[in-house]
A protein has these predicted regions:
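An N-terminal structural lobe/cap that precedes and organizes the functional/catalytic core
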Residues: 2-156, 169-172, 177, 189
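Histidine/acidic-rich helix-loop-helix segments that form or flank divalent-metal centers
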Residues: 137-216, 220
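Conserved small/polar residues in nucleotide/adenosyl-binding loops
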Residues: 227-229
Length: 229
């Protein structure tokens, strides 16, 4: 048995019902529940078809205004995180569909110009509104309030992702715990997740993505600095 199979986020896990919960029912009952896809596979498809995901291709990871075609973009970064987290999840026996959905979603709220752009926007928000800009909160705002997809009746609705995938957006922010990254037990309102590492991620799969995020950007950023700049 793979070491983490007993805590993987599948049906039977004590957290399962919370993990797959959505803000509202996904489909009108007249159309059925589209059983050919899992809950997290639906989320993955919703994300890669939304405009916020598409815009990641125009946002560079670290260096801006580059003259080099091989500078890493956000969309490349999330795909690398998807690949790394998928490898780790499969090795440990975790739910790789969940890690993939979290991976492609985790940076959905990032500003242009990387963390420097985030800092500038935060300064403006603090000065003008007494608030701050943080890509973790902005990602939740995008998928919960701004991004729309047509349902089976042609009505535009927000993405309405599962709790476990939404949790991975603020949950990936900040460095992993150096003493070991473990998920939290509490089912918290994600709107209360207002800064990095306020809460641990809710699932082991989100912990894997948090670590994969660090693996991805540390190696790629170093490569960019040494070879492409």
């Amino acid at each position: 048995m793979k070491k983490f199979e007993n805590v993987a986020m599948y049906e039977g896990n004590p957290k399962w019902e919370n993990a797959i919960s959505r803000n509202e029912k996904l489909y009108d009952p007249v159309y059925g529940d589209a059983p050919m896809r899992t809950e997290f596979d639906r989320d993955y498809t919703r994300i890669i078809n939304c405009n916020a995901y598409r815009r990641l291709k125009h946002k560079t990871q670290v260096f801006f205004a580059p003259k080099n075609d091989h500078i890493c973009t956000r969309i490349e970064h999330v795909n690398l995180v998807d690949s790394i987290s998928n490898t780790i999840a499969n090795f440990l026996g975790l739910n790789s569909e969940l890690t993939s959905a979290i991976a492609v979603t985790h940076d959905i709220g990032h500003s242009p110009f990387g963390h420097q752009g985030e800092s500038i926007l935060s300064e403006i928000a603090q000065r003008e509104y007494g608030d701050k800009f943080w890509h973790g909160s902005n990602g939740l705002h995008l998928i919960d309030d701004l991004e729309l997809l047509s349902d089976l009746a042609g009505v535009k609705r927000n993405l309405n992702l599962t709790y476990a995938v939404r949790d991975g957006i603020p949950g990936h922010c900040g460095n992993p715990n150096p003493n070991g990254q473990k998920p939290r037990e509490e089912f918290v309102d994600l709107k209360e997740f207002t800064f990095s590492n306020k809460f641990a991620p809710y699932t082991w799969e989100a912990c894997v993505v948090k670590i994969a995020d660090n693996i991805s950007y540390l190696g790629r950023d170093l490569e960019l600095s040494l070879i492409h700049i």
